[in-house]
Design a protein with these regions (language model features):
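Surface-exposed, charge/polar-rich loops and edge strands
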Residues: 1-154
């Protein structure tokens, strides 16, 4: 765990839950409040991660938090090449909350990460650039029942 935290600290400022600037009074888990910040649950404890400036990007796709997590932590530190196919990764939708992340780590995973949500402005910037959003970078509620919108005419 120490080696992993040291590897993460090469690309992120890392603070343990309860350290100055990491956590809100009365809260027991870290939900990122701004772009470029991540929560990490590891070894029964929450950590706050903030990407170091030299690893930020103005590219509309590379600058997304989901890309930063993949390009700066999951790929280089954990060896996750393709998050869509790597069996070591699972995705938990936003409505299930931080307690679900904690539960999964206590049962069958080693670490969990929470991210600040992708904004509509970021999504539009990617579309305007003619690029594609990375896998699992968006979460919208409510979900359409069939995935299609059907409207009866007449």
């Amino acid at each position: 765990q120490e080696d992993f935290l040291a590897a993460v600290a090469e690309r992120f400022d890392v603070a343990a839950w309860g350290d100055p600037g990491c956590g809100e009074p009365g809260a027991d888990a870290f939900w990122p409040r701004e772009k470029g910040t991540f929560g990490m649950f590891l070894g029964g404890r929450w950590y706050c991660l903030r990407v170091k400036p030299e690893f930020q990007s103005s590219d509309p796709v590379k600058g997304l938090d989901v890309s930063i997590l993949q390009d700066q932590l999951l790929g280089p530190v954990l060896g996750v090449g393709d998050p869509r196919t790597d069996k070591r990764i699972d995705f938990i939708g936003g409505i299930r909350g931080l307690k679900e992340l904690e539960r999964r780590v206590s049962e069958d995973m080693e670490a969990a990460f929470s991210m600040y949500p992708t904004s509509i402005e970021e999504l539009l910037a990617v579309a305007d650039a003619g690029l594609l959003m990375p896998p699992k970078s968006t979460w919208f509620e409510p979900k359409l029942r069939s995935g299609l919108f059907i409207h009866r005419l007449g």
